[in-house]
Amino acid sequence: MKKQQLIVASIGLLLLAGLYFFGNTVSAKKIQPSPQEAKPSTEKLIDTKDILQASESKLDPGQSAYVNRLKNSVVRGDVKSQQLKAFQQLTSFWRDSVPDGFLPAAYYLGESAKLENSEKSLTFAAQLFLNNLRGQYPALKTWMANQAKELFERALTVNPQNDSVRVGLGGAYIFGGSTANPQEVMQGVQQILAVARRDSTNMYAQFMLGLGGIESRQFDKAIERLTRVVQHEPAHLEAIITLAEAYDQKGDKAQAIQWYERGKKFIANPEMIKEIDRRIKALQ
């Protein structure tokens, strides 16, 4: 698959990612690639230019002209406020006017956050990338992880004491890592463990370690961490569904069904409930 085609296909994996602009739910739904698309790619890494070109190739002439005007105003603008306004307009355009515009919207949101340089805006933009890392194509995952890392690192510069940001940065290393670079994954784990050891009640750290356990296929460790989270936060939907996933992948069908059923109680979206019901039926 050519790089341009890969990016366009990857954009389809993020159809529900816009939910994160308005509030966190469970992770954005991923559409599974075909077997051919799922094969590891030996092509060079995707960069921001590739992302923007692939996204802009789907615009109509009027939309293209509008985007180009805004991008040109960023290049010409020598005043920070002008650049910030243009980035905010580009974020709004891709978020609100383009159904598959998550990637450029998230990118421009990050650029806006860098100009604002506030802990809140940097963390929000970084979290948007982090929340959608799992399950992506390797090349796209690397690009998204790099965006998240830079934003989290900037937020830590603003406030080095923010443990949630440190956990998020660790997560970006874990989920953006690759088998070719396992030291990055371990770097992320150590970042989060440092927080968890210092504060055993930090459920965000426990949750991220649980996700990391699934990522590394250490299901017993994942189950231990995620169980701790749902004991402290019984309505933590993502932890509940992820715990069900851990039991599912471990092969414990009874426990997987039990946790999937529990998760349904906190879901209002009929389509999501149907997906879970299909999974439960497959396990029975």
Can you say where each PLM-predicted feature lies in the sequence?
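N-terminal leader/linker segments that initiate helical-solenoid repeat arrays
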Residues: 2-104
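Short coil turns that delineate tetratricopeptide repeat
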Residues: 81, 116-117, 160, 200, ...
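TPR alpha-solenoid repeat register
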Residues: 86, 121-122, 165, 205-206, ...
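Canonical tetratricopeptide repeat
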Residues: 89, 124, 128, 168, ...
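Short coil/turn linking the two alpha-helices of tandem helical-hairpin repeats
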Residues: 91, 96-99, 126, 130-138, ...
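Residue-level recognition of tetratricopeptide repeat
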Residues: 92, 114, 127, 171, ...
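Structural signature of tandem alpha-helical TPR/SEL1-like repeats
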Residues: 99-107, 136, 141-151, 179-194, ...
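Alpha-helical adaptor scaffolds
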Residues: 130-131, 154, 161-232
